[in-house]
Amino acid sequence: MAVFTVNGQRVETKKNQKLLRFLRDELHLTSVKDGCSEGACGACTVIINGRTCKACVPDTDLLDGRNIITVEGLTEWEEKVYTYAYGKAGAVQCGFCIPGMVMCTKALLDVNKEPTDEEIKYALRNNYCRCTGYVKIIDAVRIAAKVMQEGTLPEEINNDWHIGSRVARIDVGEKVLGTGKYPDDFYLDGMLYGSALRSKYPRARVLSIDKTKALALPGVEAVVTAEDIPGENKIGHLKHDQYTLIPIGGLTHYLGDAIALVAARDKETADKAAKLIQVEYEVLPHIHTIEEAAKPDAPKVFDEEENNICAYKHISRGNAAEAIKNSKYVISHHFETPWTEHAFLEPECAVSFYDEDGDVFVYSTDQSAHQTLHECSLVLGTDKVKVQNALVGGGFGGKEDMTVQHLSALLTYVTKKPVKMKLTRAESLLVHPKRHPFYMDMTMGCDENGNIMGVKAKVAADTGAFASLGGPVLERACTHAAGPYHYENFEIEGTAYYTNNPPAGAFRGFGVTQTCFATETLLNMMADKVGITPWEIRYRNAIRPWETLPNGQIVDDSTGLVETLEAVQPKYEAALAAGKAVGIGCAMKNAGVGVGIPDTGRVKLIYEEDKKLHIYSGASCIGQGLGTVLTQMIVSNTDIKREDIIYERSNTWISPDSGTTSGSRQTLITGEACRRACEKLMEDKKAGLSVEDMIGKVYYAEYLAKTDPLGANVPNPVSHVAYGYATQVCILDSKTGKIEEIVAAHDVGKAVNPLSCEGQIEGGVVMSIGFALREKYPIDENCKPISKYGSLGLFRAHEIPKIDAIVIDKPGLKVACGAIGIGEITSIPTAPAIADAYFRRDGVRRYSLPLSETPYERKG
C-alpha cells in the first residue's frame, strides 16, 4: 500500500501494481496511454516530483509520498498554451503520443524557459512518434516556450479555413489534452476482458482442445472455441482464408493464430486462464522462406491450395528485352528489402457491448468501419452489428485487417456483456500484417544520352500466413516499378508466396517503396555510366504533362515531377559544389485504388437540430486529418463558416461507406464526394431555403473514380485517376557521415492544408529513414518474430536530421478541387536517396536494406 498525490489529490493504493494500471484502471486518467507496457514508447509519460517518468515502469508501492502529474492536472493556462502551440505547429496527427509529449514539454519548460533546439530534442528523446517525424512537435515546444515567456496567448487570427489555409486540425484540443477516446479509453459497467490462446507452432494440426481448467478459474465467464462461433469461422480482407479460431482438425498457419478466447472479470485472470487451456497438436514441417515455399514438394501452407503461390503478376508493354539488347548501357542487379513493422503507437483494441437496439456495438480502431462491420457480421451470423470508429492511434496500412474487433464482438455475443479485447504489444508485433520483404532482379538499358530504353524485372515477395492484401501490393509494386519516367518498353514478373511467417499486407507505400529502391538505385548507377549527374538523368527522363507512362497512361497537366526536381536542384547542386555526399531519388504513387476496381467516396451533409452542419462519411480518420480536409472543402464550396461545421467520426449506421483509408485515396475520392454534396446544399440555399428549412435534410453525394483494368485492351489505359510525384535529396555531414538534411519536394496537386502536407512529408521521411538505415523486424527459423517495441530500431527526436519539406502546389486535377493525397508517397523515394548518398561518400554500392556500414547500423 502507498499514499501519494495525483494532480493535487491524495490517493491510497490497495495493491501493488504498475502506476500505469493504477492511473488508467482505477482513476480512469486516460490521457496516460498504454502503448507498450515495456518502458519503450513513452506514451504513458507522467511527471513525478518534477521529472518525467514512464508510468508503465514504477510499482505503486515505490511511490509513497510522491507527487504525480498527468495531463489532466495541467492548469487552465497550461491547457491553453499547449493546445495553441501544438495546433499552431501542426504537431498533432493520430494523437496517441501527444499527451506524453505534452508532459515532456511541461517538465522542460518548468525548469528551462528558453530551451535550445538541442535541449528540446533531448527532452523528447525517450518518447516515440510514428506519425509526425518529430519536426512539428519540436516546433510546438518552441512555440509553447515563447508563449510562456511572454505570458499571453497571441490574438486569434481570423483564418478563413478555405482550401490552401494553414489551419490547426479540428481535433487538436481533445488529442493534446487527452480527452478524446481511443477504444482502450472506454471503461463500461460490468465490462469483461478478453484474452486469446495462440498457436504454439507455426504449422500444426489441432487435434483436441481441453478448456476444463480454464473454466474452473474464479473470475472466468467464458472460454470460446471454434464450435461456439454462430456464423462463419473464416474471414479476410479480400479472401476469406483466416480462421477466427482454429477448429479441431484445422491447420495453423502462423504463431498468431487464435485457438481459443477467454472472457474474464479482469485482464490478469483472462491471461492466466488462456494459459490453462490445453491443446494437443500434430506438429508439421513449416515454411520459413520463399525458397522453401517455391519447391515443388514443399509442404502447403493451406490444405486447400495447389501450391504456395498467393499471387502472380506479369505486366508487359513494348519489347523490353529487345530494347535492352539494343541499349548503349545495360545494368543488372539483385536487390532486397526487409520485413518492416508499422509500429503505430496504439496497440489494437476493441470494446463491444449490446446497445439498446439489441445490436452488438463495437468501438473500433481500424481503417474502415464498414469493413469491420462486414467481417464481424460474418462471424456472428447476423446483421445486427454496429461499428463506431473511436480515435485511431495510427495505422499506415496495419489496421486494414481484422485483429481484435471480431474477437471482442464474439465474446460479447457469447457472454451478453461488454468486453474489451486489446492486444499486448508483443501480440500486436506478431498478429497484424507487415510490410512485405521483396527480392528483386532488375535490368535497365539506356542510350548514350541517358534516356531509358527499357526495364525488365522479376520480383518475389513473402506474403506470410494469409492473403491479406498481398495480391494488390504485388500488383502495385509491379506497375510502379517502371518509375515516373517517359519510356515505352517495360516488363515485370512478380510472385507472392505464402509462408508460415506472420502475414504481410498493406504498409505505407503499398509495395512501391520496395521496387522504387531497386529502380532508383539502378538509375543512379546508370547516371555514372553515362557521365551525367543523377539529377540530370532524372530530369531528362521525367514524365511531363501529356506524355505517356510505361503503363500506357497519358498523364494530364496536373503532373508535377519536373517541378519537384527543379525545387530540390539548388540544394542538390550546392551540396555537390561543397564536396558533400549527396543522393537523390524520385517516385510516383497512385491516389485511389485504380486498375478498374470500383473506388467510391460517399458523404452525407446534414443540418441537425443544433443548426450545425454535420459531416458523415464512412472513411476512417487515422491521423491524416480527413476531418479537417472535409471541413475545408465545405468552407471553400459553400457560405458556411468553420464554427458551424461538425465532423462526425465514421460509423456504420449513418455514415455511408467510403472505402478504406488507404492508397492516399480519401482526400481525392471522398473529398470530391464532399464537394458534390456541397453543390446540392448550395442549390437549396440559392433557392432561398434557410438553415431552419434545411434541418434534417440529407445532402448525399458520391464519386466513383473510373479506371481501366490492368491489361485492358485499349491503347492508353487510365490505370489511376491521379498520381502524386516526389523528389527527395539526402545530404550527408562530411565529418560524421550522418544525414545532415533531407530535402523532400512533393507534388500534392492543390494543397488543402499546407501545414498538414508538411507534417505528412516529415513523418513519411523519418519513417523511411528508419527503413533505409536501421529498422528491423527479424523472424527466426521457427517463424517467431521480434517481441519488443523498443528493439525495432525506430528513430527518436534527437536523432532526426533537418528536413526541408517543399509542398509543390500544382492544381490541374479536375476533381476534389485539384487535391491529391500524399500520405503514402512521402515514404517512397527516401531509401534510394540515402543509399546513393552513402555510395557518394565511400564508393560502396548497397543493394539491400537496412544499409550496412553506416553510422546508424545496429550490430548484432
Residue ranges and their predicted role:
Residues V46, E174, G180, D184, ...:
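Short beta-strand elements
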Residues A145-I309, V330, V414:
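Flexible, low-hydrophobicity surface segments
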Residues A258-I259, A264-D266, K417-G464, G671-V691:
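Phosphate/diphosphate-binding loops
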Residues A320-V379, E475, G585-K612, S617, ...:
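Conserved beta-alpha junction segments in alpha/beta enzyme cores
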